[in-house]
Amino acid sequence: VSDRYAVVGNPVGHSKSPLIHAAFARQTGQDIAYDRLLAPLDAFAVTAQRFFHEGGHGLNVTVPFKREAWDLVDECEGGALSAEAVNTIKRVGNQLIGYNTDGKGLLADLERNLGATITGKRVLLMGAGGASYGVLQPLLERKPDLLIVANRTLDKAERLVRHFHKDASGVPQGVAARPYDNLGGQPFDLVVNATSAGLEGAMPPLPENLFAPGAIAYDMVYGLETRFLAFARANGVRCTDGLGMLVEQAAESFFIWRGLRPDTAPVIAQLRSDH
């Protein structure tokens, strides 16, 4: 019998995770079954526990359950601790271990696939929701010259910044929260959209001179030409969606579960050509 894995979310029908993990399994000769698991909005824990009780080996967790997954697991590793969000669960004996592979996925896509450098650069992170919690710490570990978190409601951005800078002085080094209408006058080398604004279409008020020469505009949403990417393209900026991040965070999950690192490039290329 194949080892069972699944992605759990609501909605989950659109998820590309089963395709990605099937490709990884073929590539590495692993015998796994990977399904979609729709959890009722009020029954994530029950759904996940049943899956593991019935012999499931691991889960990927997507919107809107990453925070609940953090509450569910018995212990957290690495990025999941700081993010207070879990997107990968591994069953070890009767313990559930939680991980967050979003930050590693973003960095792998930016650095390996896109050849971007973050160290010493000026970075803008748009949004202060769960997606930002998952990637802020890994971005900061690359030591950018400046990292600004922008959000419609400033106090949410300030809360995010404080969450990751609980040092004695209480003064974050090189990271600050700003409202969108206070971003002018300093172009950024990397702008990451971690809001769902890409989906709804409404875009925050961004200044014309947002992008430095050679900048990269990165939208975590994939498969859609978002308003943000259209804005960046109109400014002549190099643009990319979140498909690479999706595949890279999946590869990190696969490594956690199976101990093997799949080759992501052919899988990204396959998904791009399918779209």
Where are these regions (language model features)?
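Short acidic low-complexity segments
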Residues: 168-188
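Rossmann-fold NAD(P)-binding glycine/threonine-rich loop
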Residues: 216-264, 270
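NAD(P)-binding Rossmann-fold cofactor-contacting core
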Residues: 142-167
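Short glycine-/small-residue-rich Rossmann-like dinucleotide-binding loops
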Residues: 63-64, 193-198, 221-222
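Rossmann-like NAD(P)-binding element
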Residues: 153, 182-204
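Glycine-rich adenosine-cofactor-binding loop
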Residues: 9, 98-103, 110, 114, ...
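Phosphate/diphosphate ligand-binding glycine-rich loop within oxidoreductases
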Residues: 2-114, 224
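Rossmann-fold NAD(P) dinucleotide-binding segment
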Residues: 68, 199-217
